[in-house]
Amino acid sequence: MKSKFIVPVLKPESYLRKILSTPQGILYIGKYPIKDLEAHILVGDIVSNTLRGNIKIIDYKTRRHINIKPIINEPLTNLVNPRGTMSLMSRTIAKAKNYRTIIVKGEEDLVTLAYALENEETSIAYGQPDIGVVIIKSNRLKALRILKTFKPDIVVYNKV
């Protein structure tokens, strides 16, 4: 039997999800793996395996269904983050600054906002499926502007 988790989250409005699904930074077009790029925060398994970065946010999946095992050589932790949300636990883990690899049960995309809040200036790299890699420059103020539009919610999560 699967365990159920009650997860406090922040959810973006639907209009914002559409905006955030388009590339928000510089798009490097090319076949995977694109190498010779680096960013402070890497989001996604393929990007985390091929680029250089300080923090890796992964979920052992590509396009939500293909399981892959990235190379992990640093301290890691697990995080429950339901799809389309930023769990409050992601903020706690980002603030702790003890982990270089975060394995997400759910969806990793919005977890990056928690890390952007912790840095005056940061760079984030993520994959744009079938196109390439996006690198965006972010900072605490940009993250706060986005997060202030999110609404608090509770999600019952039973996919762990």
Curated annotation (Swiss-Prot):
InterPro entries: GTP-dep_dephospho-CoA_kin (IPR007164). The keyword Endoplasmic reticulum does not apply. It comes from the Archaea. Its EC number is 2.7.1.237. One of its GO terms (molecular function) is GTP binding. The keyword Transferase applies. GO terms for biological process: coenzyme A biosynthetic process. It catalyses: 3'-dephospho-CoA + GTP = GDP + CoA + H(+). Pathway: Cofactor biosynthesis; coenzyme A biosynthesis. It is an enzyme of class 2 (transferase). Keywords: Coenzyme A biosynthesis, GTP-binding, Kinase, Nucleotide-binding, Transferase. GTP binds at residues 45-47, 59, 61, 108, 130. It holds the Pfam family DUF359. Belongs to the GTP-dependent DPCK family. PANTHER family: GTP-DEPENDENT DEPHOSPHO-COA KINASE, UPF0218 PROTEIN TK1697. Catalyzes the GTP-dependent phosphorylation of the 3'-hydroxyl group of dephosphocoenzyme A to form coenzyme A (CoA). This is GTP-dependent dephospho-CoA kinase. It comes from Staphylothermus marinus (strain ATCC 43588 / DSM 3639 / JCM 9404 / F1).
